[in-house]
Amino acid sequence: MKRISSARVLQLRGGQDAVRLAIEFCSDKNYIRRDIGAFILGQIKICKKCEDNVFNILNNMTLNDKSACVRATAIESTAQRCKKNPIYSPKIVEQSQITAFDKSTNVRRATAFAISVINDKATIPLLINLLKDPNGDVRNWAAFAININKYDNSDIRDCFVEMLQDKNEEVRIEAIIGLSYRKDKRVLSV
């Protein structure tokens, strides 16, 4: 709630001062401030000349911050920046090669979300790996990313068939959606 309130205040204030403040938060010693700074940089409108700098700050946080919470927020914010400017898609692919294997569940979930924002078949092996993650939220976001981007191959379909038995209801629903969309008759076994 604190993040959203902070972001709204800064969005309303807008301008370079708000961007500078968010950037300053990103290098704070306190992880909560870094998390808020990363969140704000994903949401706030920034000038074109600042985009590269902001994306690079977020990417650096994604790969190097000590706090898994901050890394996850930075990943989500890079995805938000990418939605505003798809030129950053290759950088999302590149960072995902690392973050998809992070020990933090939140980082892996954020990675699956970030991959859902881009459409790059190079991410399919990462998504298939995330479909097999021990955490249901990660599996659900990976399945969502596959479905939203309409990726299809036999490995994806086989994973979706296995996911029909998943203990997580949202994962099962994404698997049903995925198999139905692909007109795979194995969905009828549900």
Model region roles, listed by residue range:
Residues 2-14, 35-49, 69-87, 106-120, ...:
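Structural detector for internal amphipathic alpha-helices that build alpha-solenoid repeat scaffolds
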Residues 13-27, 47-62, 84-100, 120-132, ...:
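Amphipathic alpha-helical scaffolding segments comprising HEAT/armadillo-like alpha-solenoid repeats
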Residues 29-30, 66-67, 103-104, 134-135, ...:
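Short inter-helical turns and helix N-cap capping residues of alpha-solenoid HEAT/ARM repeat scaffolds
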